[in-house]
Design a protein with these regions (language model features):
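Short cytosolic juxtamembrane segments of multi-pass membrane proteins
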Residues: 392-407, 952-963
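Alpha-helical transmembrane segments, especially those used as permease/efflux helices
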Residues: 11-18, 236, 242, 267-270, ...
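Membrane transport/envelope proteins' first extracytoplasmic loop
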Residues: 2-281, 293, 351, 355-359, ...
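Interfacial "coupling" helices/loops that link adjacent transmembrane helices in transporter permeases
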Residues: 8, 12, 276, 283-327, ...
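Juxtamembrane segments of multi-pass membrane proteins
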Residues: 65-67, 73, 464-467, 471-481, ...
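Hydrophobic transmembrane alpha-helices
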Residues: 24-27, 271-287, 324, 332, ...
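C-terminal transmembrane helical bundles of large multi-pass transporters
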Residues: 598, 605, 609, 675, ...
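Small-residue-rich transmembrane alpha-helices
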Residues: 324-355, 367-392, 421-436, 458, ...
Length: 963
């Protein structure tokens, strides 16, 4: 039976390849994710290992012992006076201090703008270059800085900006931007790329001045004399340093601590694997459908095997072997495709300025094993039901014409099973969303299982819905086909004219030249122009989809040019023929047959549509939820901000120097300038965002919704007093007059008295849970920086006013002024960019479903070869056959859309209800939903191109004899 299975696959190479392709994309996503994250992990591991290679003990500020939003809170600096005391210890061979900051040092590009890093660190270093053993950087050109006006920068920035040793480079820090002489170019150890991150390194005194570390260091590295262990050295150091202000660690302890900062790679891994799982899940539907159709088409073959003695177990083994080989083939291709995908993803991150440190390609044994295992297991599980179905073929079917498989004993109960699964899915989703005491992992598991069961339940129920849905969407499909035909008609006429000019006989030279020239104009100019206009119009429904269509039109133009060249080559070789004149009019017979064909086998149509349904449901879910969040975000900001302008960082999310706010506050046009600083602290036992406000001005530019207090509460805010938001007050049972403690990152604890309680929007509050006065904030926090500055101007916002404010910020290129409306629009753009990334990743699932539709149509054409031959024999033209197959595909796609779009909206409504406490609104983006339906219809048309072409070119006599 192994030989039978392998010969069967060899005889159906195209079907086997298309089936394997359904698993390739999912496996590629899995292997690509592992390869990419392994490259990133190795790079970070190399960075940390090399940074502390010669360090036996490491001294840093006392860790506050808490995290905020998953990130370690930066410890305070240490006194530089510790360094001489450490150097005098008997077991110390060498010690050196370091100044380091990862956010405020911005290298300015040649256009005068700060280099954007997409959220990656912008390091500023002060290094003792006389102790090279502790220097993690490696020169690639020039020398190290020795004077206050000298700097060395990273090789990536130097290459991107064409900076060379001897150039003048401007750098912005906590001080106004100033020029430095570039004396060196360096890289981080042996790591060739640190991603989008940048660094500028100075002398220690210069760094202390630029980064506000007067008399302070961020760390001290110490090496021991030969024979002294790291533990002995740490013990000795602890005897001469203030342990209430510093931490002393061994090299191993410090490397472990540093690696916590790279834990975000796990988030990237799980994020990408989620979409890989979705693609694999959709692929499983495609494989199930393909193998089911294949089994149905091979009834006589299986019956013959049964007749000559094959047992049911042997048939089960044969089909399972086919599934195994297809899965293994798909997994192997997917593994190698994943390596290319990892390189592509890294290039994509770099293109959007968000690349991460990486090393060379790493294909770990774990990656190979998991990729192959997933591909084979998913295919075997998906092929189990068709394999079992094959065992039920009776031997007598070998001599019957048109024999079909008997219905299973459980078939009558499937609708009830489907309804039960849908009910179970709703229960799981409700449990995951509304249960209050669930751990995050359990909640996510319940939601994931709920979605999985819901999709399976709807897929099992959909065969009952197919006949009704087919009748409903058939008229839509008819008009869709007319619209598509009209849009592509100039292209088709151009192709017909061009082929006529090449191949037609009995025409004059002038007619031939006219046909060739006219065909080329229609084919390469007018046709693509009409397609481009249609794609451009799609931008008004969905910008992302519109641009995707525009790219598709460009690709189409390239394909058409290649087709023209190949057609000329074929003509020179004496091959080819003139095609039929393409038609446009409605064809009632074709229209009716296409609808009947989709209803002929509801199970097959439903399984094909289910794959597209899942992809569309997820895209719709994300679009509706994201649009609700975007609207909630916009309204939350509009409720809070009263000022005309916002002063923010150039990249929109970093902090900015307080000096920038002070500079713009002096502008003649500014009536009110209110700085807002931000930090982290442990308030009443829990970690919260702490903001510093200007008591005299904040109420003029920020709208407080007071629950207990008035604007006077903050106007008179003094030291050891705070205003808090209502959510924090309710959680900690606080009210006006209550007292609570605040612990800062320096480890100091202060008592605070509540002077007012206000209600902040739960979605995107601009102030922290606890707010104190600016003077008091500056006392508690090292190097305080502005989160943003609210600006109200005389006479309202205008272009001239903004130009004047920008001139006042000339020394602070890392800050920018935006109107209130422009700043809100920028927040919307961030949502749109993230949504675009999700669309790109979910496109894999849609592509897999497209492969499934192609597969089903190809197999359907094989199965109906005699039927198609009969239709041709009784007068149906090639164009009619082609149109019938295309319309079948569009009907199937519309059924998938009719199921997927409402399902996605339903899931989004559930999640929105669960997020009601955050004021997330339910606002379906109707234009986007229409665009998704159009995409589904176009997917149906594209999926039918090759099958329709094959069906229209069947030889009539051979088709009538086909078995």
């Amino acid at each position: 039976m192994i030989r039978v299975a392998l010969r069967g696959l060899a005889g159906r190479k195209l079907r086997a390849f298309l089936t394997a392709l359904a698993i390739v994309l999912g496996v590629a996503m899995v292997s690509g994710t592992f390869v990419l994250t392994d490259m990133i992990d190795r790079a970070f591991n190399d960075i940390f290992t090399q940074s502390y290679a010669n360090t036996d003990a490491y001294i840093s500020g006392k860790s506050p012992g808490f995290t905020f939003e998953g990130d370690q809170v930066t410890p305070p600096s240490v006194s530089a006076s510790i360094l001489p005391a450490v150097r005098r210890l008997p077991d110390v061979q060498a010690a050196a201090g370091t100044v380091a900051d990862d956010a405020v040092t911005k290298i300015i590009d040649r256009k005068g703008k700060p280099i954007t890093t997409g959220g990656a660190p912008t390091f500023g270093f002060g290094i003792d270059y006389s102790e090279p053993r502790f220097n993690p950087l490696k020169l690639t050109a020039g020398r190290w800085p020795t004077a206050p006006n000298e700097v060395a920068i990273d090789s990536g920035t130097a290459g991107d900006q064409n900076y060379e040793v001897g150039d003048t480079v401007k750098v912005a820090t906590l001080k106004p931007v100033r020029p430095f002489k570039l004396v060196g170019i360096a890289q981080y150890g042996s790591v060739g790329s640190i991603g989008s991150a940048t660094f500028a390194t100075f002398t220690i005194p210069a760094a202390q001045a630029l980064l506000d570390r007067k008399g302070q260091l961020d760390a001290i590295s110490v090496s021991a004399k030969p024979g002294v262990s790291q533990e002995q050295l740490v013990t000795q150091i602890k005897q001469v340093v203030p342990l209430n202000k510093v931490d002393v660690r061994t090299r191993a302890q410090q490397v472990k601590e540093a690696k916590k900062s790279a834990s975000f790679t796990k988030i990237i891994k799980y994020f990408l694997l989620t979409f890989a799982t979705i693609a694999l899940f959709v692929g499983a539907f495609v494989i199930f459908n393909t193998l089911s159709i294949t089994v149905s088409q091979r009834i006589r073959e299986f019956a013959t095997l049964r007749t000559i003695g094959a047992s049911r177990r042997q048939l089960l083994t044969s089909v399972s072997i086919e599934a195994f080989v297809i899965g293994l083939l798909g997994a192997i291709i997917g593994l190698f495709a994943g390596i290319g995908l990892a390189v592509g993803l890294n290039a994509f991150f770099k293109a959007v300025n968000s690349d991460l440190p990486t090393t060379g390609l790493i294909v770990a044994p774990r990656t190979v094993i998991i990729s192959l295992l997933i591909g084979v297991v998913v295919t075997l599980v998906a092929g189990l039901a068709p394999a079992v179905k094959a065992t039920k073929v009776p031997p007598i079917a070998a001599v019957r014409e048109g024999a079909t498989l008997p219905r299973g004993r459980l078939a009558p109960f499937l609708p009830f099973v489907a309804i039960a699964l849908v009910a179970l899915a709703v229960a799981l989703l409700a449990y995951g969303m509304f249960a209050n005491t669930l751990a995050t992992a359990v909640r996510l598991l319940a939601l994931a299982l709920g979605c999985l069961v819901l999709f399976i339940g709807v897929a099992l129920l959909s065969p009952r819905l197919v006949p009704t849905l087919s009748r409903i969407v058939r008229p839509i499909a008819k008009w869709v086909m007319l619209g598509v035909t009209l849009i592509v008609y100039p292209t088709r006429i151009g192709a017909w004219l061009f082929r006529r000019g090449l191949y037609a006989r009995g025409i004059t030279v002038l007619q031939r030249i006219g046909a060739l020239v006219g065909g080329l104009v229609m084919l390469l100019v007018i046709g693509p122009g009409l397609l481009f206009a249609a794609a451009w119009a799609m931008r008004y429904l969905s910008s992302a989809i519109g641009w995707g269509f525009i790219v598709a039109v460009v690709v189409t133009e390239v394909v058409l040019v290649v087709w023209v060249v190949l057609s000329v080559i074929r003509r020179l070789r004496g091959r080819g023929f003139a095609s039929d004149l393409p038609g446009v009019r409605f064809d009632p017979a074709t229209d009716r047959l296409s609808g009947e064909n989709t209803r002929r086998n509801p199970g097959r149509t439903a399984a094909t549509a289910a794959a597209l349904m899942i992809g569309l449901a997820l895209v719709t879910f994300i679009a509706v939820l994201a649009n609700g969040m975007k609207q909630s975000n916009r309204r939350a900001i509009e409720r809070q901000v009263k000022s005309s302008y916002m002063l923010v960082s150039a990249n929109g999310f970093d902090s900015i120097s307080p000096s920038a706010g002070d500079a713009v506050a002096k502008a003649p046009a500014v009536a009110v300038a209110s700085n807002v600083r931000s930090g982290v602290g442990k308030a009443s036992g829990s970690v919260q965002q702490i903001t510093g406000l200007d008591p005299k001005t904040i109420s003029q530019v920020y709208n407080f919704e007071w629950k207990d207090g008035t604007n006077t509460s903050i106007d008179n805010l003094g030291p050891y007093e705070a205003i808090i938001d209502k959510a924090f007050a309710d959680k900690k049972d606080l009210s006006v007059g209550s007292r609570f403690s605040l612990q800062t990152p320096k480890g100091e604890t202060f008592p605070l008295e509540v002077k007012g309680v206000y209600k902040a929007p739960p979605f995107y509050p601009l102030l922290g849970e606890v707010s104190i006065s600016l003077p008091f904030f500056d006392r508690l926090y090292e190097r305080p920086q502005n989160l943003y500055t609210f600006l109200d101007v005389k006479g309202g916002a205008s272009d001239s006013t903004q130009a004047g404010l920008e001139r006042d910020l000339a020394n602070f290129p890392d800050a920018k002024v935006e109107t209130r409306g422009a700043w809100i629009d920028a927040q919307d753009k961030d949502f749109d960019n993230f949504l675009l990334l999700l669309y790109v990743l979910l496109a894999l699932a849609v592509i897999v479903s497209l492969v499934g539709m192609i597969n089903t149509l190809v197999l359907s054409v094989f199965e109906r070869t005699r039927e198609l031959g009969m239709l041709r024999a009784v007068g149906m033209t090639r164009n009619q056959v082609s149109r019938m197959v295309r319309q079948e595909s569009v009907i199937t796609a519309l059924i998938g859309a009719a199921l997927g779009l409402p399902l996605g909206v339903f899931l989004a409504a559930l999640v929105t209800r669960a997020l009601a406490q955050f004021n997330v609104e339910f606002v379906p983006p109707w234009k986007n939903l229409i665009a998704f339906a159009i995409v589904a219809m176009i997917a149906g048309v594209l999926a039918a191109v090759a099958p329709a072409r094959r069906a229209s070119r069947l030889n009539v006599l051979r088709a009538l004899q086909y078995e």
